[in-house]
């Protein structure tokens, strides 16, 4: 049997499918998620149910978002899960997670995410951060390092700044390729994202922040002065007490927010 087949399903490369099979890792992740009936529990990419089954076992209802029609069909006819699942067949990148919120209940979102969409999916989920209590994701280890990076490090970038603007970021555990079928060519890790109830550095317009950060990191090796010359002057940098000769990875999240807020003030 091909090493890409698990429980009779062949992993599809175009969907980035790698199925988690290590029971010890599964137990650790479920413990970190802490499933309960006080939140709307949402799984992205349930696959063959490695996390779905133990989580659903602890709660009354689990909402899942799955793109693969074959896997959706398996879930719909699953002897144990079918009565506990609310299944949405579709692309999580296009999905309106806001529709899942219930009165008085925030969401707990989790999943073993396809690595080929993990970064854009993070940005999509940040748009619903105010409706989410916690997020737990299995990701490529490199992405976890980017999410949790500190200023001045190679991993620090656009994803870091936006993730840490919206959330407290906590690495949970590292997972070797042998924990999956088929084994991915990269190491994996689990991350916990805790959206802030009150943001420590409030931004007047997050679209402005997003544009500023994207522009700053378009050319990582160049200085802020060069990358942001169409947005901020030397006088602006001086007023903010930010050294314009620094590179984008040397600037902290609150400094990016301060620059974005200055841009908002200029537009008013």
From Swiss-Prot:
| Coiled-coil regions listed | none
The family database entries (SMART domains) matched by this protein are listed as: rADc
> Mind telling me which SUPFAM superfamilies this protein's record contains?
S-adenosyl-L-methionine-dependent methyltransferases
Compartment(s) where it occurs, according to its Swiss-Prot or TrEMBL record: Cytoplasm
* GO CC annotation terms, alphabetical: cytosol
Q: Which reaction does it catalyse?
A: adenosine(1518)/adenosine(1519) in 16S rRNA + 4 S-adenosyl-L-methionine = N(6)-dimethyladenosine(1518)/N(6)-dimethyladenosine(1519) in 16S rRNA + 4 S-adenosyl-L-homocysteine + 4 H(+)
Provide the binding site for S-adenosyl-L-methionine: 18, 20, 45, 66, 91, 112
Q: Does the keyword field hold DNA repair?
A: no
Q: Annotated Gene Ontology MF terms?
A: 16S rRNA (adenine(1518)-N(6)/adenine(1519)-N(6))-dimethyltransferase activity; RNA binding
Q: In terms of one coarse class, where is the protein primarily found?
A: cytoplasm
What are the entry keywords? Cytoplasm, Methyltransferase, RNA-binding, rRNA processing, S-adenosyl-L-methionine, Transferase
Methyltransferase as a keyword? yes
The top EC class is transferase
A family per Pfam? RrnaAD
What EC number(s) does this enzyme carry?
2.1.1.182
Similarity annotation: Belongs to the class I-like SAM-binding methyltransferase superfamily. rRNA adenine N(6)-methyltransferase family. RsmA subfamily.
Q: What does this protein do?
A: Specifically dimethylates two adjacent adenosines (A1518 and A1519) in the loop of a conserved hairpin near the 3'-end of 16S rRNA in the 30S particle. May play a critical role in biogenesis of 30S subunits.
Identify this protein by name: Ribosomal RNA small subunit methyltransferase A
| Lineage summary | Bacteria, Pseudomonadati, Pseudomonadota, Gammaproteobacteria, Alteromonadales
